[in-house]
């Protein structure tokens, strides 16, 4: 094998010693990464340029390594020494270039490791964000449940307040009815008192009339006694006169006049006695009738007074009972009014507390929604960065694998075409320049295609991540599928470009 192939195999073996074989490198590079989009784009540009420079330098070294001395017998030792020095210089330059490329590739791999570390940190943060995004649902459920409980309590308080208002209205109507009844009873009591006063006046009049009648009866009795005394005196005088006249007549004509005088006296006495009896009977009858009338009036007045007193006593008892009942109802009404005021104050305080709680919960919900939207935007940005890094890493991996495949196939074909120990094949400078231009143009075209694919992937990811609120898992699955498709298309394009070169 020639010097260029040995040098390439040595470089490839040094790559494998430092970074492992291609399978481990591809597995390590295929992991997700995370960083800012600006850093990833600058890294992709620098790495694509370094890859293109590495490809051109490797192809140039390959072409120069396979140059052989011309097969002329007249080559002197000075030309051989010049060729040897030229080969040494070229080899030294190639070693320096490969060393620089190795250093740059090591820096690139270190950056990849850093990106992997950042990717793991971002994945942990994404898991935390998902967990935090899953929490607001429970917060919403708790908020809805507490809101339902508060609404139920508010409805219970409203129903209790309505019931208390109905009871208050009923008690107010009862108080109005009792107040009207009390006023009616008061009016009845006043009428009874007026009637009692009138009856008392009548009783006083009857008493005065009875006293007057008693005085009249006493005067009549005195007059009757005086009349009787006068009558007795007159009768005695008349009898004395008659007796004197009879004695005188007896002296005149005792025998003839005695029977007639006795009969006359008897008749006069009988007349006076009948007149006195009639007067006494008439006086007694008048007194008895007057006394009966007065007794009847006094009995009626006494009965009326007794009924009035009983009625007054009954009215007083009813008034006292109604007063006690009114006082009790007034106290109950005042207590109910105080309870209603306390209920209204407590209800107002509870409603204010519930309103404050609802406002606090709504503000918390708005904050949670804004925080969720911010986390969704951060997640979308991180997902865009992750997709861009996945695309870049997949493109770099495919480019490296394609370069390794191209160099290995190119070295084998050249070694198979030049089996002689001293081949006289020399690559012309035109072929070397065309190869370098093809490599650089392929690198630029690949870079442009990669940028276009990255823009398309970012647009696709931005379109898909706009629906993150509907489902994180669905968006993530679609992004992974699009990443795989993009990596596959990049692999196919890099393979086709390597085959064309």
From Swiss-Prot:
**Bias (Polar residues) ranges:** 488-501
Query: Region (Head): which ranges?
Result: 1-87
Q: Does the keyword Mitochondrion apply?
A: no
One example of a Gene Ontology biological process annotation: cellular response to leukemia inhibitory factor
Keywords of the record: Acetylation, Coiled coil, Developmental protein, Differentiation, Glycoprotein, Intermediate filament, Neurogenesis, Phosphoprotein
Which PROSITE patterns does this entry report, sorted A to Z?
A: IF_ROD_1, IF_ROD_2
The domain of life for this entry's organism is Eukaryota
Q: Where is this region: Linker 2?
A: 239-262
SMART domains in the record, alphabetically? Filament
Give the family, as the similarity comment puts it.
Belongs to the intermediate filament family.
| Name of the protein described by the UniProt record | Alpha-internexin
Q: Which organism is it from?
A: Mus musculus (Mouse)
